[in-house]
Amino acid sequence: AVEQMQEALGPELAGRVVRNPRIAIDYLAMRVPSMTQVYRRLQGIVHEVISAAFSNLVIMPGETTTEDVVWWMRQRLNDLGLQTWFHPSVSAQRRGVASDELGDSPVIERGDVLHCDFGITAMGLNTDTQHMAYVLRDGETDAPEGLQVALERAKRFQDILLEETKVGMSGNAVLEAVLAQMQAEGLDGTMYSHPIGDHGHGAGPLIGLWDYQEGVPGRGDVPVIANMWYSTELQVTTPVPEWDGQPVRMALEEEAEVTTDGEMRWVLRRQTELHLVR
């Protein structure tokens, strides 16, 4: 097709044509700086909805199911005049109980660890966020230390991603660097981050897939560019002493931007502590 266009243009005009095989990808991946303020507002809405969903406003331990929380989130977005780009999910982990034993929509009990995956669409933009929560047992004022440590280890994996991502590196090169540092620090994690913006899973380099931790052919070979957004999607699994060494998975996802100067930073902020249901 390019050759036909050049032939139709003739030598003089064809000589002005610059070939760039990545122009379509870069056009979709690159964000206009003025979008960031709008996107930050959307992230604020997401955090507000999640904070309310993971509270006693919505959850009554022993009665509320995970599916009840999902549909509260959908109703809240509908009330705000917004919509999701995928159906939200809420899941639970429980001491001494395998995840498959809990079923698809368990009743939330005290002592449960909760996880949500939630994304909204507004003004032509998409978000994708995952947070973790803990349901306090009677007499508790905070989550057990082992669960707090588990969250800190997942946050450290986020830090590693932000530190290792550089403009010009391919997604696969970033993945390799991130996993090497993860292993050096003794973390048991998985990296599966993706571009976001006009589309929930946007154009640009993938940094892993959950089942492709050795690199993603094609999509992982594209280089990171300045002025793009990422959903920093990942998980770290940590044995928790208070749960008799049972592994607990902390899966986090927040939006980050690659700035004009090549720094990767949070669009709004990340989750720093477990949401607490009292």
Model-derived features: positions:
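Active-site neighborhoods and metal-handling regions in enzymes and metal-associated proteins
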Residues: 1-278
